């Protein structure tokens, strides 16, 4: 597509969200230049602090904007399907909890590192200009009073500085610690809060087992969780048969914290006490200790901003606008949905052949209005899921309620779906994160009312009463919210990409 010299868009940050939106914009006729703080990740090995991420149809829908089946196919080729949780109890037993109503609804486990490399490559192929080693130091919007120019100042390794004058909007995708977000706050344009969990995380690799089919050292179809109340391990499969494990634990101020687990003896005692069955697949103790001592502790936090944009001049998206904890597996999906919504609005109100500041302002204002309540909702649900995975997944009564929930969504599919299904697979219709949160609270209340004294299995639930409760509590709320549960779609092939006029 021919490019108009007056449709320049600058993106600060070339991570997952920045690279995907850059690719979409460039392919649709805009001229995109990107500035990334770090050196080219394609030349740097993974740094041992990258949680495997989960892709669902909600996030993959953004890739359909390109009308290119290659992207979707490549996502499947780079990933491993995951159909549910496998809970490893402290007595050595296992319990399985399906994600969707059946095995046709699954998530994709993929390496963040590999996905970032893939999206960068595709963005460059499309014509995006990527500039690495550019750490944003300051942003000056003052010249916007008399011109359509913004001054960006970057620092580089060794202290050298670069001044870049850009025309057109600046989009911020520079992550949870976004420099651009801080500068917008310092300029009085918006405010935000950062809430850090007392827990942190470390990556621990489960090596592939050449003696097992495909080399998979654990069941490849599950998200494996070892819940131990004050700490837990999660593990997701990689395509080579290994698993990326993540230990979540207090960073400090606790006898069992990353700060206190330093010596070989302390680490060995900890794993032998709490994770003896995991040791069978984690490999030699020497390797576990090495990873615990060398891998950095990652921070977990939630960012909530009062606004995401400055008129038509600047707009934040992805983690830069609303970082969330990883416990619902929706950080990347939420960011990719941002890309879909933001592109759709820009293309409608400021198309590449007529990109005006007024049109961009309409697009960015609508983006903030639509995405903020949904970002806040998924942030809350992610924090709730942290407590669920740490404390509840090992509880027999909780597992009973989840089996009842699964029974109901199979028996009453058009009127009852789990919160998880609405969150992960509901993006194809009008089931927003906000709607999923509100409906999820009501449907879980129904489950709790059905699991009365004496009920020990899902088969004992009174389905006539369930039908009545659903009609009494859920159906009116769905009608009020204009939610259609039949729009919960896992298959990316069946997803539609709505226009902004039908969405807002």
Feature locations, PLM:
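Conserved N-terminal helical subregion
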Residues: 2-8, 56-203
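C-terminal helical "tail/cap" subdomain of flavin- and related membrane-associated enzymes
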Residues: 3-5, 344-504
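Conserved mid-domain beta->alpha element of the FAD-binding
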Residues: 14-23, 27, 296-384, 388, ...
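Conserved Rossmann-like nucleotide-cofactor binding loop
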Residues: 17, 21, 40, 177
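A short, Lys/Arg-enriched amphipathic alpha-helix followed by its capping loop at the start of a domain
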Residues: 21-30, 62-65, 126
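Glycine-rich FAD pyrophosphate-binding loop
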Residues: 26-48
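Generic enzyme active-site microenvironment
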Residues: 34-35, 172, 317
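Conserved FAD-binding catalytic core of PHBH/FMO-like flavoproteins
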Residues: 121, 149-300, 304-310
């Amino acid at each position: 597509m021919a490019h108009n010299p007056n449709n320049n868009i600058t993106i600060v940050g070339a991570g997952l969200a920045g690279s995907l939106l850059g690719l979409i914009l460039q392919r649709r006729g805009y001229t995109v230049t990107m500035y990334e703080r770090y050196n080219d990740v394609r030349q740097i090995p993974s740094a041992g602090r990258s949680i495997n991420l989960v892709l669902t149809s909600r996030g993959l829908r953004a890739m359909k904007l390109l009308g290119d089946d290659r992207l979707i196919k490549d996502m499947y080729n780079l990933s491993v399907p995951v159909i549910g949780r496998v809970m490893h109890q402290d007595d050595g037993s296992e319990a399985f909890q399906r994600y969707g109503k059946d095995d046709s609804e699954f998530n994709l486990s993929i390496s963040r590192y590999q996905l970032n490399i893939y999206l960068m490559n595709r963005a460059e192929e499309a014509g995006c200009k990527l500039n690495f080693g550019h750490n944003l130091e300051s942003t000056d919007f003052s010249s916007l009073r008399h011109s359509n120019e913004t001054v960006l100042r970057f620092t580089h390794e060794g202290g050298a500085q670069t001044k870049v004058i850009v025309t057109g909007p600046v989009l911020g995708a520079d992550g949870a610690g976004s420099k651009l977000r801080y500068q917008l706050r310092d300029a009085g344009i918006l405010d935000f809060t950062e809430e850090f969990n007392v827990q942190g995380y470390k990556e621990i690799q489960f090596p592939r087992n050449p003696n097992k089919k495909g080399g998979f050292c654990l069941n490849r179809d599950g998200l494996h969780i070892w819940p131990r109340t004050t700490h837990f391990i999660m593990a997701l499969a990689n395509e080579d048969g290994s698993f990326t494990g993540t230990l979540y634990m207090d960073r400090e101020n606790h006898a069992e914290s990353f700060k206190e687990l330093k010596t070989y003896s302390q680490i060995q005692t900890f794993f032998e006490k709490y994770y003896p069955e995991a040791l069978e697949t984690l490999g030699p103790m020497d390797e576990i200790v090495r990873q615990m001592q060398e891998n950095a502790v990652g921070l977990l936090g939630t960012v909530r901003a009062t606004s995401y944009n400055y008129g038509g001049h600047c707009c934040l998206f992805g983690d830069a606008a609303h970082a969330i904890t990883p416990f619902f597996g929706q950080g990347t999906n939420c960011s990719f949905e941002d890309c879909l919504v933001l592109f759709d609005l820009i293309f409608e109100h400021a198309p590449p052949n007529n990109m005006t500041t007024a049109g961009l302002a309409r697009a960015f204002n609508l983006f903030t209005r639509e995405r903020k309540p949904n970002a806040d909702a998924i942030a809350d649900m992610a924090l709730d899921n942290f407590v669920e995975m740490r404390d509840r997944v090992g509880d027999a009564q909780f597992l009973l309620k989840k089996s009842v929930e699964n029974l109901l969504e199979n028996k009453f599919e058009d009127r009852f779906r789990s919160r998880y299904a609405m969150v992960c697979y509901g993006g194809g219709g009008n089931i927003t994160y906000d709607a999923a949160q509100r409906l999820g609270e009501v449907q879980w209340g129904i489950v709790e009312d059905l699991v009365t004294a004496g009920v020990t299995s899902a088969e004992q639930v009174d389905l006539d009463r369930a039908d009545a409760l659903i009609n009494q509590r859920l159906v009116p709320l769905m009608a009020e919210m204009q939610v259609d549960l039949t729009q919960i779609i896992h298959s990316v092939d069946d997803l539609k990409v709505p226009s902004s006029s039908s969405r807002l």
